[in-house]
């Protein structure tokens, strides 16, 4: 499995990358591999405020469906609309084209409370 060291991870298998004062979020390589071929992604609404740990969306595969959780609290500022037509971007490039949404966190320091790649992998 590929879990880049520059990212942070939630125990619910989301990853976070800081870009300026925003965070970019998707699901980990481990999560997409466990789900199998994705066929549908429900993204959060732009402008919606989410609390850490609450449901932010859903990914569906040929095997099952799984909730996407907000890794930190904040407001959604952009979603990856390309996933509507190509949910398999998450399977092919979970940390690239497969990002799910961007958020303005209430407190960017909350990202520091998430797991490093080594701690995330140790919990798998």
UniProtKB/Swiss-Prot annotation:
Report the record's Gene Ontology biological process terms: glycine decarboxylation via glycine cleavage system
> What Pfam families does its record include?
GCV_H
Q: Which cofactor does it need?
A: (R)-lipoate
- Note on how the cofactor is bound: Binds 1 lipoyl cofactor covalently.
Where in this protein does the record say N6-lipoyllysine is found? 63
Describe the protein's quaternary organization and the partners it interacts with.
The glycine cleavage system is composed of four proteins: P, T, L and H.
Q: State the similarity comment.
A: Belongs to the GcvH family.
Q: Which PANTHER family match?
A: GLYCINE CLEAVAGE SYSTEM H PROTEIN (PTHR11715), GLYCINE CLEAVAGE SYSTEM H PROTEIN-RELATED (PTHR11715:SF3)
Q: What is this protein called?
A: Glycine cleavage system H protein
Which organism is this entry from? Acinetobacter baylyi (strain ATCC 33305 / BD413 / ADP1)
């Amino acid at each position: 499995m590929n879990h880049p060291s520059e990212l942070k991870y939630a125990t619910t298998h989301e990853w976070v990358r800081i870009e300026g004062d925003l965070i970019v979020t998707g699901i980990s390589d481990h999560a997409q591999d466990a789900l199998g071929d994705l066929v549908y992604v429900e993204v959060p609404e732009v402008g919606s405020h989410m609390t850490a740990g609450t449901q932010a969306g859903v990914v569906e595969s040929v095997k099952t469906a799984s909730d996407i959780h907000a890794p930190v609290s904040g407001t959604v500022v952009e979603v990856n609309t390309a996933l509507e037509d190509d949910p398999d971007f998450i399977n092919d490039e979970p940390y690239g084209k497969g990002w799910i949404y961007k958020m303005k966190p209430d407190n960017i320091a909350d990202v520091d409370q998430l797991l490093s790649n080594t701690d995330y992998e140790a919990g798998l």
